[in-house]
């Protein structure tokens, strides 16, 4: 049995959870604001969905304004009735074909997120994010030599205006010398071919940028999310939903900082994530998983800084959180696996600290848990993970036995 995402900030809060020091700690993908369907799922598109009238950006919501469903440069070139199996259909780089989600007019073709630090190739004038473009010597779209790169401030202003007007949970309208807050919490973002909750949209853009290693872009979008959620907390108080959302977004910010090599900022974000998640009742598997992952990631960073006592403290806290969750959900296989992984982390630190007895006990306890775990045949992914962690634990016990001889 696998756990399904129920918390509004489920396991998506950790886009690089598989990168932790030990293998076997894996989270499933999903949006932290999981009320919306996956934006890149073709089945989530609604027929006849149009942008709201009166928006200054509405005319540019579709480059093919006349109703064409294909890329203008490719229209008419593809014979859908062709039976030639050797012919590979051309793909529009902007996604205007039936097989992929559409990229909006303010998106970077490379990271597929909203443009950040918009930069234009010279002389071909194609526009991408600065970080994405600097990896190429030729234009990724047309192949022309890049003689120089120019900042496109006007386009970036339009992107920023779109975000402020449409993607933020709230926006402010200047009224004389005062700022009047206009609430838009229940309105959705309609961009390209999807309609999403406002918070979900920014998190989606951050996750796309993170996957493309455009960490500055991801960090910028997540910072907006934290600002908006903090504002909501100020108005509505520490509700479980908002605390879980903020805890997960802060964890994602920690991942960005860690990927950028800023371990001190990463620890700060993870610790703040833990602070908010600890305010929630720990009877929800998604909340306890996110909390334990944040604690483990702080432990990893302390371990890399060679602060072994601090690392063990955080690993042990994560283990205790997972033990409590296993007591409340004794029939959740993923929770048992998480406990075994935490036991391995703590035992490994104990061995490094030359506490061999505690280390061996930890490895053996993890082995007993995994050997007694019975999975259904459809849980192939969990079974693979169980075998991987079990093999690691057995090797550690064998090493201890050889050392004792």
From Swiss-Prot:
<feature type="zinc finger region" description="RING-type">
    <location>
        <begin position="108"/>
        <end position="142"/>
    </location>
</feature>
<feature type="repeat" description="TPR 2">
    <location>
        <begin position="292"/>
        <end position="325"/>
    </location>
</feature>
<keyword id="KW-0862">Zinc</keyword>
<comment type="function">
    <text>Has holdase chaperone activity that may fold catalase to a functional structure. Not required for the peroxisome import of catalases. Required for the activity of catalases and acts mainly at the post-transcriptional level.</text>
</comment>
<dbReference type="GO" id="GO:0005634">
    <property type="term" value="C:nucleus"/>
</dbReference>
<protein>
    <recommendedName>
        <fullName>Protein NCA1</fullName>
    </recommendedName>
</protein>
<dbReference type="InterPro" id="IPR013083">
    <property type="entry name" value="Znf_RING/FYVE/PHD"/>
</dbReference>
<dbReference type="InterPro" id="IPR011990">
    <property type="entry name" value="TPR-like_helical_dom_sf"/>
</dbReference>
<feature type="compositionally biased region" description="Basic and acidic residues">
    <location>
        <begin position="37"/>
        <end position="48"/>
    </location>
</feature>
<dbReference type="GO" id="GO:1902553">
    <property type="term" value="P:positive regulation of catalase activity"/>
</dbReference>
<dbReference type="GO" id="GO:0008270">
    <property type="term" value="F:zinc ion binding"/>
</dbReference>
<keyword id="KW-0677">Repeat</keyword>
<dbReference type="InterPro" id="IPR001841">
    <property type="entry name" value="Znf_RING"/>
</dbReference>
<feature type="compositionally biased region" description="Polar residues">
    <location>
        <begin position="76"/>
        <end position="85"/>
    </location>
</feature>
<feature type="region of interest" description="Disordered">
    <location>
        <begin position="1"/>
        <end position="85"/>
    </location>
</feature>
<keyword id="KW-0863">Zinc-finger</keyword>
<feature type="repeat" description="TPR 1">
    <location>
        <begin position="247"/>
        <end position="280"/>
    </location>
</feature>
<keyword id="KW-0479">Metal-binding</keyword>
<keyword id="KW-0802">TPR repeat</keyword>
<comment type="subunit">
    <text>Interacts with the catalases CAT1, CAT2 and CAT3. This interaction is not induced by alkaline stress or H(2)O(2) and NaCl treatments.</text>
</comment>
<keyword id="KW-0539">Nucleus</keyword>
<dbReference type="GO" id="GO:0005829">
    <property type="term" value="C:cytosol"/>
</dbReference>
<feature type="compositionally biased region" description="Basic and acidic residues">
    <location>
        <begin position="13"/>
        <end position="24"/>
    </location>
</feature>
<dbReference type="InterPro" id="IPR017907">
    <property type="entry name" value="Znf_RING_CS"/>
</dbReference>
<keyword id="KW-0963">Cytoplasm</keyword>
<keyword id="KW-0143">Chaperone</keyword>
């Amino acid at each position: 049995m696998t756990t399904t995402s129920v918390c509004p900030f489920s396991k998506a809060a950790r886009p690089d959870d598989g990168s932790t020091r030990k293998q076997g700690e894996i989270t499933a993908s999903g949006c932290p604001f999981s009320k919306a369907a996956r934006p890149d799922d073709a089945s989530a598109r609604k027929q006849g969905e149009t942008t709201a009238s009166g928006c200054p950006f509405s005319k540019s919501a579709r480059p093919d304004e006349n109703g064409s469903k294909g890329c203008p440069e490719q229209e008419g070139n593809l014979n859908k009735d062709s039976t030639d199996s050797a012919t590979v259909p051309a793909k529009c780089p902007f996604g205007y074909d039936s097989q992929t989600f559409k990229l909006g007019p303010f998106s970077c073709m490379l990271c597929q997120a909203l443009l950040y630090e918009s930069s234009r190739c010279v002389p071909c004038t194609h526009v991408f994010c600065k970080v994405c473009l600097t990896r190429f010597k030729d234009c990724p779209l047309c192949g022309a030599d890049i003689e120089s790169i120019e900042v496109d401030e006007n386009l970036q202003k339009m992107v920023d205006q779109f975000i402020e007007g449409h993607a933020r949970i709230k926006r402010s309208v200047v009224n004389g010398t005062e700022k009047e807050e206009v609430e838009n919490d229940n309105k959705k973002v309609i961009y390209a071919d999807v309609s999403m909750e406002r918070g979900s949209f920014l998190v989606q853009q951050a996750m796309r940028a993170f996957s493309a290693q455009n960490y500055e872009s991801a960090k910028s979008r997540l910072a907006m999310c934290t600002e908006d959620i903090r504002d909501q907390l100020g108005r509505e108080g520490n509700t479980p939903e908002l605390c879980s959302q903020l805890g997960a977004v802060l964890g994602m910010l920690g991942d960005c900082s860690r990927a950028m090599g800023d371990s001190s900022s990463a620890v700060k974000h993870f610790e703040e994530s833990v602070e908010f998640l600890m305010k929630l009742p720990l009877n929800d598997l998604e909340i306890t998983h996110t909390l334990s992952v944040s604690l483990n990631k702080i432990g990893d960073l302390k371990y890399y800084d060679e602060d072994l006592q601090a690392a063990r403290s955080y690993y042990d806290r994560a283990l205790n959180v997972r033990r409590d969750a296993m007591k409340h959900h004794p029939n959740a296989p993923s929770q048992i696996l998480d406990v075994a992984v935490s036991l391995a982390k703590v035992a490994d630190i104990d061995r490094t600290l030359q506490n061999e007895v505690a280390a061996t006990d930890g490895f053996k306890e993890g082995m007993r848990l995994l050997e007694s775990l019975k999975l259904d045949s459809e849980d192939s992914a969990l079974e693979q993970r169980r075998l991987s962690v079990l093999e690691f634990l057995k090797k550690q016990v064998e090493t201890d036995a050889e050392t004792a001889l």
